[in-house]
Every structure is written in structure tokens, then in C-alpha cells.
Amino acid sequence: MTFDNLTAISPIDGRYANKCPELRDVFSEYGLVKRRVLVECTWLEALCDAKEIKECKPLSAKERKALRAIASEFSVADAQRVKDIEKTTNHDVKAVEYFLKEKVKGTSLEKRGEFIHFACTSEDINNMSHALMLRDGKKVLRAAMDEMTAKIAAMAKEWAKVPMLAHTHGQPASPTTVGKELAVVTARLRRQAAEIDRLVMPAKMNGAVGNFNAHLSAYPKTDWEKLSRKVIESLGLRQNRLTTQIESHDGIAELFDAFCRWNSVLLDFDRDIWMYVSMGYFKQRTIKGEIGSSTMPHKVNPIDFENSEGNLGLANAVLGFMARKLAISRMQRDLTDSTTLRNMGVGFGYTLIAIRSTLKGLGKLELNAERLAEDLDRNWEVLAEPIQTVMRKVGMDHPYERLKELTRGRRVNAEIMRDFVKALPLPKDDKARLMKLTPSTYIGLAEKLARLA
């Protein structure tokens, strides 16, 4: 059976293939091999530039350009050649080394062939390649995350003034505005995004057990830590000086945990919007030709938010597992991280699919102002809070208890609440303010806070 979207095992490459195409260049096998080639070429270039490594002659401008082109012009056909070599070597990184030696054969770079992968352990190449994948994958996700936050912020400002009955423990609570509740989400998303932005991926280039053993055996006078740092930082990464054979993956765990927190905020938002749709606070625009149920023709379901919720759960399951697992490796290393790291794109893929599903759902939402107003008008008991607060202010006896007796577990209307206020011996200004108050106007600073989105 040939491979295409219909025969793919994973829905990321099947049903949802058009939802995250940007990640293919990053997290595919091609993406990994491409970055291995980049790391190997960058290391060779640094060795050629090191004056004390006399056997690795300096590069001419033409040679430097040719070496860099191997990495920058790396194609899917090149990646296939690496995989063909791997069939013989049964070693993925060694296959990259042999591929590069093939590429420079017959050129002036060939005489530097034995300095390809010089003094490196495979993990020197792999950890930097994975770090580059995460750096590039993070850019893709951050763009989508910012689009999400901007969309919610725009909605928050548009509906900053629209009053809404809040619900705590699923029960009517003090009113707020639609915009302010959306603004809360933007603040939460931005905080977690800032944590993601703060993280620069660590990397190592220090040999088989992290001590530069092989490096010093060949060139004992070279400052290998400095040279290693130069290569790592030239690729936008941060040097981890203290490692075993592997870079400890704590930085990856931190990044995945940060993505999990951001995802959890979005998942919480998906569920809230789902609830508001079910309560009638939002309506969903119908799209001609779409069907909500195979048997109930009237249905318009919040499927985009449900899809997002499911994919966020999958993303966090993968990223959360990886964050826990990757921090653990036996002694100087075991190979359990290798197969685990091949699934980085799965967590990123489900996250991107989820974000785009939520954005699609938000694009269909319409505010149901009439339904919001109805719910507020049915719940005048929420004004028990301001009334008892003013009663406390003027020193009246048992204000909380009196309002509790009037309102708890029962429906009250405007007439009942206003008759209660009329009978209170309150100062004129306080009484007038309470008499004017309605559930729709009892929103505190919600409108102002909404504009912080």
C-alpha cells in the first residue's frame, strides 16, 4: 500500500495533514537529517578556522561557500541518500558523516574529510540537531499562539461593555462582562508564552562523556570549551558545560512543561466557550452544506472547540510524558531518549492542530446579547452582595444574614429587591445608588479591565 493522507497511521499526517504542514520541514526525518548535516558542516568550518589545528587547513571563500551550500541546499533526495547509506551502517549519524565525505569527494574539501565528525560522539550532533528542531518548531507554534491571543484580545475589547452573569460552582454569581472574562484568558496565555520565549535551548559539543577526552588527545593546547561554545552559540543555542554523553534534556523538559501550561489555558478556554454556547450566550454561524448530526437536522455543534480540546489532551499527554522521561537516563546515557525524541513533532503537531481548530471555532461565534440580558434579568438575587455590603458600611445589624434569608435558594425579581432596599434606613445617596442598580450595571471595573487585553 502506498503512503498518502488516506493510508497514514497518524492523523497528524492523515486527516489533519493540511493543519500543520509547516512542521514537516522541522520534525520529519528529513528535518532531523538536514539539521545533522548543518551541525556537522558548522563544526568542520569551526575546525578549519581554528589556527592551532594546523592539519585542518583554513577555508578559501569558495570552499566556505561550497561547504555551507551542502547544508543550505540539502534536499529530500540528499536525505534519501543518507538513509540508503544507513541501510549499510545501521547507524544514522555515521551515515551523515559518510554522506558528507561523498559530497566533498573530488573537491578541494576532500583533504579535510577526516575532520568531518572529528572528536564527536553521535550525541554531540544529535542534541544540537534536536535543539535546532525545537528552536524552529517553537517559532511555528509561537506565531499560531500569538494569532490566538490577538483574536481573543480583539473579542475582549469588542465586548468589553457587554454584561454577563458570572457563574461560580456552576451557580449564578456577581455579574461581569464578556470582554473581561476573555481578557483574563489573554493574560494567562501571554504569561505562559513569555516563559516559552525566555527559554533558549541548551546544547553540548564535548565528546563521548562530556570531558573533551578525544579532543585533548589530539590537540591538548586548544581551548575546546571556547571552540565548542562558539559553534553552539553561532546556531542560536546555549552551551551546557556540564554533561554526560547526553545533554541532560532538562531544558527540553522545561520547554515542554511550558507548552503544556499554555495548552492547559487554551483547553480551559475551549471548555468555557463550549459551556457558553450550550447556555446560549454565543450562537454559531451556520455554514452552507455542513451537517451537525446524521439524524438530527437542527444540530449546530461546537465541534471546533471539542476537536481542539481532544487534540490539546493528546499534545499534553505526549509533551508531559517526554518532560518526565527525558530528565532520566542511566549513568552516562542510555538510548531510551532517542526513540522518545523522535516524537517531539507529535506534541507540537497536536498543539498546532488544536490552535487552528479553536481559531476556526471563534470565527463562527456570534454574541447572543438577548440571551445574556435575559439571564441577568432572571437573577436579581446577585444584587444581595452590594446591598449587604452597603448595609455593613453604615453599621446595620446582620446585613449578610438578612440578605441570605431573602435570597438564598430562591428567585427574586426587581420588585422584591427594590422593596427591600426602600425599607432600609440608609443614607439618601446610598439608597439612590442601590435603587438604580441592576444586574446589568453591577459590573464593577469589568469594562476597564477588559481593555487591558
Feature map (PLM): residue ranges:
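Conserved catalytic cysteine-centered active-site region
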Residues: 103-109, 228, 232-249
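Generic, well-ordered alpha-helical scaffold segments in large soluble proteins
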Residues: 42-47, 99, 103, 151, ...
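Glycine-rich anion/phosphate-binding loop at the beta-strand->alpha-helix junction
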Residues: 192, 238, 244-330
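Glycine-rich cofactor/substrate-binding loops
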Residues: 1-34, 86-90, 280-282, 293-453
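A helix-coil-helix interface module used to build multimeric assemblies
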Residues: 2-215, 219-230, 292, 305-307, ...
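Short amphipathic alpha-helical segments with heptad-repeat character
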Residues: 135-142, 146, 153, 183-186, ...
